[in-house]
Amino acid sequence: MKPTTVSTLRQWKQQGEKFASITAYDFSFARLFADEGIQVMLVGDSLGMVVQGHDSTLPVTLADIVYHTEVVRRGAPAALLLADLPFMSYATPEQTFDSAARLMRAGANMVKLEGGKWLAETVKQLTERAVPVCGHLGLTPQSVNIFGGYKVQGRDAEAADLLLEDALALEAAGMQLLVLECVPVALAKRVTEALSIPVIGIGAGNATDGQILVMHDAFGITGGHIPKFAKNFLAETGDIRAAVRQYVEEVKAGSYPAEQHSFQ
């Protein structure tokens, strides 16, 4: 299979072709996802909650992400593979370069970091050193203690304007992809249309260029609180492969996420 690249995603955006992505943490699921049509995967620090059993992403280490990136890459050699820079792994320029280099050597095509325009210089420096960057705005889980919980972001006009400013500043600094999490549909549409780079949504409505789900949410195996934006595709199909195919098909058709999965 021909490798999926950032250029592929840009072409899809230009053509109005939506795409599905998902988190992956191991070889077998990565291979299954690739077999069923998912070409973009994220080794997310969400593994701290759904794999390791923590109550947040904060305990996840760089070594954790490196390990899971290596095994996911073996399962999906042609996928565009994103890897999270975990909490406090990009606090200084030197630390950032070292962390990013380790993830790229492990098989990542791009590193993802959380934060606004204050990270513009970091994005610029990584890009200049041949490390592609995916940004993450809206609800950024590493900032859960600042937000006071997992809450929808950008609901008032001022917050929405600031988020758009952040997105534009990061794009100008060299960001090549953006994840928007838990923001109102109208704001996600506004950001997606304002940026030339692809935007992936999670809890951001269906106006974004792509969608991403934590795999455990897509299969209904998280237990406890179920996010509003999640849909249990396994419950409807009874088969993991069929569930993945349905997820891909609904994203491409624009039927997922529906209104009940979105914030106004």
Curated annotation (Swiss-Prot):
Catalytic residue list: 181
Any coiled-coil regions, as ranges: none
Keyword hit for Transferase: yes
Cofactor: Mg(2+)
EC number(s) on file: 2.1.2.11
Cysteine disulfide partners in this protein: none
Binding residue positions for Mg(2+): 45, 84, 114
Key words of the record: Cytoplasm, Magnesium, Metal-binding, Pantothenate biosynthesis, Transferase
Catalytic activity, reaction form: 3-methyl-2-oxobutanoate + (6R)-5,10-methylene-5,6,7,8-tetrahydrofolate + H2O = 2-dehydropantoate + (6S)-5,6,7,8-tetrahydrofolate
Cellular component terms (Gene Ontology): cytoplasm
Pathway in which this enzyme or protein is active: Cofactor biosynthesis; (R)-pantothenate biosynthesis; (R)-pantoate from 3-methyl-2-oxobutanoate: step 1/2
Cofactor: how and how many bound: Binds 1 Mg(2+) ion per subunit.
Subcellular location, record wording: Cytoplasm
Any GO BP annotation: pantothenate biosynthetic process
Residues binding 3-methyl-2-oxobutanoate, per UniProt: 45-46, 84, 112
UniProt superkingdom: Bacteria
GO molecular-function term, one example from the UniProt record: 3-methyl-2-oxobutanoate hydroxymethyltransferase activity
CDD domains to which the protein is assigned, alphabetical: KPHMT-like (cd06557)
Enzyme class: transferase
Subunit description: Homodecamer; pentamer of dimers.
UniProt family annotation: Belongs to the PanB family.
PANTHER family: 3-METHYL-2-OXOBUTANOATE HYDROXYMETHYLTRANSFERASE
Protein's job: Catalyzes the reversible reaction in which hydroxymethyl group from 5,10-methylenetetrahydrofolate is transferred onto alpha-ketoisovalerate to form ketopantoate.
Protein name in UniProt: 3-methyl-2-oxobutanoate hydroxymethyltransferase
